[in-house]
């Protein structure tokens, strides 16, 4: 099995709204954390939540952290789509897929997937309708099924694991609507005993 797995997310769009806030850790380190919701089209029909957990002002070498500075501008200016529509601030974010592990009220472990933000930059180009929220990741797939949907057409669902930078196994399931993609996984017939390691995007 590979030692380095791909797991990348790229998002461009308008700052729709956010819960970003300046905070201080118990050890006295200033940082910014919270959720930045990004509208990936001019009509804000698709909004992607991006989670920034711990963004500090400088890197280990002492250089300023441009992502911290940009998130600070978003907090200070609050130039959001909710307030200003399509004239709102635009951003470009790179990150990865991660799982938010927690215990439910019933005592069961839940691991919903989410986007973890790594770097954020101002975006000056127009926001296109297609291609503003993309991901590519290696995935160890243990199952595939076709789901019937009379309203929107049948779709496929794969379940398995993606990997973070520590190569931890992160359980995820993904929806597939592309017919060729559905055909590929149906023919591959991945199972727990005979999984499929492949790249998905």
Specify the residue positions occupied by each region the protein language model found.
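OB-fold and OB-like single-stranded nucleic-acid-recognition modules
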Residues: 1-201
